[in-house]
Amino acid sequence: MRPQILLLLALLTLGLAAQHQDKVPCKMVDKKVSCQVLGLLQVPSVLPPDTETLDLSGNQLRSILASPLGFYTALRHLDLSTNEISFLQPGAFQALTHLEHLSLAHNRLAMATALSAGGLGPLPRVTSLDLSGNSLYSGLLERLLGEAPSLHTLSLAENSLTRLTRHTFRDMPALEQLDLHSNVLMDIEDGAFEGLPRLTHLNLSRNSLTCISDFSLQQLRVLDLSCNSIEAFQTASQPQAEFQLTWLDLRENKLLHFPDLAALPRLIYLNLSNNLIRLPTGPPQDSKGIHAPSEGWSALPLSAPSGNASGRPLSQLLNLDLSYNEIELIPDSFLEHLTSLCFLNLSRNCLRTFEARRLGSLPCLMLLDLSHNALETLELGARALGSLRTLLLQGNALRDLPPYTFANLASLQRLNLQGNRVSPCGGPDEPGPSGCVAFSGITSLRSLSLVDNEIELLRAGAFLHTPLTELDLSSNPGLEVATGALGGLEASLEVLALQGNGLMVLQVDLPCFICLKRLNLAENRLSHLPAWTQAVSLEVLDLRNNSFSLLPGSAMGGLETSLRRLYLQGNPLSCCGNGWLAAQLHQGRVDVDATQDLICRFSSQEEVSLSHVRPEDCEKGGLKNINLIIILTFILVSAILLTTLAACCCVRRQKFNQQYKA
């Protein structure tokens, strides 16, 4: 009898548990439970005991107790982020012996109740811990962190830490990634990271550091120091082993000079943008001539930026960003050792000239950004920059360049010259005036922008034997395009822009460009287009703000199979006579941009939306015109008859009067 009673009690218990479980609004899939944003005030106690992943983020939890959390001993992933947790019961996570990932981000752990709770306690198997966004401050952090021998990733971002000491990261021998971004760190005590022998990734961005005077983390591979107030960066003078650093971010600081990085031979990524850097133009100075850190820092003596240090400094560097600095000149010696460099950004500086004339200079460089400087001269050697594919020169003052400046770049594919004063030469038979630049015969070039260069005449053969796929000649008011100026591009050109040039006549036989997909003729004074009588590849046609009144089917018929988008705003379109356009609108073959706002005019000058025009409207208009013509003809004939009749009567009367007098 007794076993039967026990069995009945067990069944009742299971039934009640199942009933309560059904009431829990959490989503359960296999061993994963999601209780996100449910307004929960405490950890649910009726979840499956074998749950391995529990997401309680976005609720209103204020305290974490050992019970019921300790019931879920199989937990591996626990997300408690974005709650209001300010109390952790001692040993709250002690029963979770399998826990590997714990997130307490964006809570209130800095409140006094968290202090009295004794911190997190030991986390023997946790590999990932997120404590970001808790207003944690120095001193409290040491009391909150417990023993975590397996911890690999720790996030302390978006807190209020001001100082790191030797004791901050104790008992974390396996830590590899440490995120401290967006704190208020001003001081890092010597040896603060000595207890982290496996640390490879360190993020110290968005803090208040002013100097790195004795960098000695040989094992570190990624270091982010961006968005601080760093005035100097110096490695240890006698490191115990070779530095492994490959990625260094120092952007948005206050560096006045290029740091001496000869001790970092493995560096492949270096970002120094948004600083105050000027490169030295003379011989190296002694340490007295170099900017020293602000007072309050016991920095080692700083050496001049070195390009000739032992070995080959920066010889493995692939990416260098020096944009938004105050560089006026690039010394020849600066580029000598950058033999592996692939990407160089020097935009937004004060450069007036750039030279790369030496044989083999920057042999691996693929992208060079010199945009938005004050460049007036550009000298590129015949065998320099042999791998360069992209050259960005927009926003400079280039003019009167050597004619074959770009023809010497054997691998050049993309060239942006927007906002300069470059004048293209003609073809081999029409070279052009002095100071023009040759764009013909550059067999590798695919994309060219000559926007806003004050070009007056585009000569015949300007791009002969240069298989461009994209050409932008916009914003050159008064541009005259000579017959044959785009000759040689018929089989390659896919994108052509001639916007804002004031063109009245287009001397380009567009139907011959069989690969053309996008054509921009906006903001000109065109009223006619050449006839596309055969099928072509054109998909997008921009005719905004021109003088088109009619787009007859005889001229546009060849576009029906390919055209997908047509821009026509700002043209004096006729409501009648545009049968081809109306058919495209009503049948939906072509997407005419903003069709509801596309206005056309009837002969009576009445303006309506083109999408509202029906064929019968034009038929009625035609009937009205015919009736008007008939009426006018009748009135004219009647007037002639009446005039003739009056004249005859007058003659007869005169004859009658003469006979009567006689």
Curated annotation (Swiss-Prot):
Residues 571-620 form the LRRCT domain. Keywords: Cell membrane, Disease variant, Disulfide bond, Glycoprotein, Growth factor binding, Intellectual disability, Leucine-rich repeat, Membrane, Repeat, Signal, Transmembrane, Transmembrane helix. Residues 1-19 form the signal peptide. The keyword Disulfide bond applies. It comes from the Eukaryota. LRR repeats lie at residues 50-73, 74-95, 98-119, 125-145, 150-171, 174-195, 198-219, 220-240, 244-265, 266-286, 316-339, 340-363, 364-385, 387-408, 411-432, 444-465, 467-488, 492-513, 515-536, 537-558. The chain crosses the membrane at residues 628-648. Pfam families: LRR_8, LRRNT. CDD domains: LRR_RI. GO terms for molecular function: receptor ligand inhibitor activity; transforming growth factor beta binding. Residues 649-662 are cytoplasmic. SMART domains: LRR_BAC, LRR_RI, LRR_TYP, LRRNT. Preferentially expressed in regulatory T-cells (Tregs). Its main location: membrane. GO terms for biological process: establishment of protein localization to extracellular region; negative regulation of activated T cell proliferation; negative regulation of cytokine production; negative regulation of transforming growth factor beta receptor signaling pathway; positive regulation of gene expression; secondary palate development; transforming growth factor beta receptor signaling pathway. Residues 21-48 form the LRRNT domain. The keyword Signal applies. Glycans are attached at N203, N271, N308, N345, N545. Residues 20-627 are extracellular. Interacts with TGFB1; associates via disulfide bonds with the Latency-associated peptide chain (LAP) regulatory chain of TGFB1, leading to regulate activation of TGF-beta-1. Interacts with TGFB2. Interacts with TGFB3; associates via disulfide bonds with the Latency-associated peptide chain (LAP) regulatory chain of TGFB3, leading to regulate activation of TGF-beta-3. Interacts with LAPTM4B; decreases TGFB1 production in regulatory T-cells. Key regulator of transforming growth factor beta (TGFB1, TGFB2 and TGFB3) that controls TGF-beta activation by maintaining it in a latent state during storage in extracellular space. Associates specifically via disulfide bonds with the Latency-associated peptide (LAP), which is the regulatory chain of TGF-beta, and regulates integrin-dependent activation of TGF-beta. Able to outcompete LTBP1 for binding to LAP regulatory chain of TGF-beta. Controls activation of TGF-beta-1 (TGFB1) on the surface of activated regulatory T-cells (Tregs). Belongs to the LRRC32/LRRC33 family. This is Transforming growth factor beta activator LRRC32. It comes from Homo sapiens. The lineage of its organism: Eukaryota, Metazoa, Chordata, Craniata, Vertebrata.
